[in-house]
UniProtKB/Swiss-Prot annotation:
Main subcellular location of this protein, as a coarse class: membrane
GO CC terms: cell outer membrane
UniProt protein name: Outer membrane lipoprotein A
Record has Lipoprotein as a keyword: yes
Keyword DNA repair listed: no
Cell compartments where the protein resides: Cell outer membrane
Keywords, alphabetical: Cell outer membrane, Lipoprotein, Membrane, Palmitate, Signal
Bilayer disposition of the protein: Lipid-anchor
Organism: Actinobacillus pleuropneumoniae
InterPro entries: OMP/PagP_b-brl (IPR011250)
Amino acid sequence: MNIATKLMASLVASVVLTACSGGGSSGSSSKPNSELTPKVDMSAPKAEQPKKEEVPQADNSKAEEPKEMAPQVDSPKAEEPKNMAPQMGNPKLNDPQVMAPKMDNPQKDAPKGEELSKDKSNAEILKELGVKDINSGIINNADVVLNLKIDEKDHITVVLDKGKINRNHLKVTNTISAQDIKTLKDSSGKLLGYYGYMQLNQVRQDENYSDEKVSLNEYYLLSMNDADKIRPTKSISYKGDMFYSYKDVGNQKLKASVEASYDDVTKKVSMKVFGENNDYWKLGEFGRTNLLENQVTGAKVGEDGTIINGTLYSKIDNFPLKLTPDANFSGGIFGKNGEVLAGSAISEKWQGVIGATATTKEDKK
């Protein structure tokens, strides 16, 4: 405390001396100034010592603050990469998930899949077509199981799964007495379908009653793949056959020649059928009245290749220039380029199936 009092007294004295020397010469005033300056300088460090002692205390608090901040800064930095890692990982994981369906899509392309499904053997196609009658569809007689068989030359035959069946006291014998099946193929050789007829005999013997039943059934067969039906984009001529029979004749198979043509301008198909015993038919649109032959001009072909409202008109006895509605005709045009015509005719008196193909190589292209 004495030192501080002395310092304060010396400071006051220096101030008084400076004030008293204010009116003197400039030279006298410079001396006390020069003398007082070191005194002030000497006192300054002494006075600053306690301040320096407080400084480290302030420094200690400041030093502690960054130590506290360091973990605070480190923690968000450590958390940020942790947060970013899954964020960066998610898009990487999502990318293959998005790409996966893109890679799968071409594999599941409908057109390609359909093309591959169409690349079947004729035997596989024939199995899908089945044995179909124009009246009843799939033949489903009791104790009869029928299959189709195709050989190396694409000849088709109907075969029985079991010719003989023994069940308790009942004995069944099935036989195919006659058949004639023709294949219908496009220009590439792919099987489109078949048409023909078959005669099936069945004998049923019941031992309990000593009873025997014999039945003879005739079937006109036609089975085509509707997916191959098409309307041609140009005019085409066809030739083929019709298998037919009259219901009152009794299992007599007849055969007729067929001439047909499709007109790309009118979108109509015309057809003439020349049968046995001077039989003759001409294709026209549905009607119930007699028409002159030149009025029977064919039937329309729909966009999908279906022959619409077809009717076969036949000759009228004693009226050579007129035709009368005789049978309903249903069918269509098939194949890669519409090179196959097929259909069936059903009447109260007769029935038949028709198959015809393009006459020239140009028509098949």
